[in-house]
Regions:
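An N-terminal boundary/leader segment
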Residues: 1-50
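Residues within well-ordered alpha-helices
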Residues: 9-10, 104-106
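Conserved SET/PR domain catalytic loop and adjacent active-site segment
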Residues: 18, 63-65, 85
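Short alpha-helical functional segments enriched in proximate histidine and acidic residues
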Residues: 31, 35, 52, 56, ...
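Enzymes and membrane/adaptor proteins characterized by extended Gly/Ser/Thr/Asp/Glu-rich
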Residues: 35-36, 68-105
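Flexible, acidic active-site loops/lids enriched in D/E/S/T/G that coordinate Mg2+ and/or position polar
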Residues: 46-69, 76, 99
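Conserved small/polar residues in nucleotide/adenosyl-binding loops
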Residues: 110-116
Length: 120
């Protein structure tokens, strides 16, 4: 996989079965790991992202996609609550806050079925 893709180019590659969502997600996770010293991400949800990617690949095989972006990984700003995921807003005061609800923003991404990799 090359260094970077646009949203549109990834959607086309997925649509034409040139690459799977799991492959894209795995590559993004590797890039995040390789750039860890940059300290760009507060939380990385590798397991959840890979499960979401596999589900997307299954939907693609059964031609049951929820959007043309189904399966393209995304990072979510650490200001938006995601059920069961530590949400700190980069504040030490919130370092242990794990919401039991979804924000409107994360519900929208879930509807598009984008594998959520990290919280920035």
């Amino acid at each position: 996989m090359k260094e970077s893709y646009t949203l549109k180019s990834l959607a086309v590659l997925l649509e034409n079965n040139k690459i799977s969502s799991k492959e894209v997600t795995t590559e993004y996770l590797k890039n995040i790991e390789n750039g860890k010293e940059l300290n760009c991400y507060n939380t990385i949800s590798q397991e959840k992202a890979l499960i979401d990617a596999e589900k997307s690949d299954e939907r693609r095989k059964s031609q049951n996609l929820r959007s043309k972006y189904d399966g393209i990984p995304i990072g979510i700003k650490d200001l938006f609550c995601t059920k069961g995921v530590t949400t700190t807003a980069s504040s030490k005061i919130l370092s242990n806050f794990v919401p039991n609800y979804e924000s409107t923003v994360t519900v929208s991404y879930t509807h598009l079925t984008l594998p959520t990799i990290n919280w920035v």
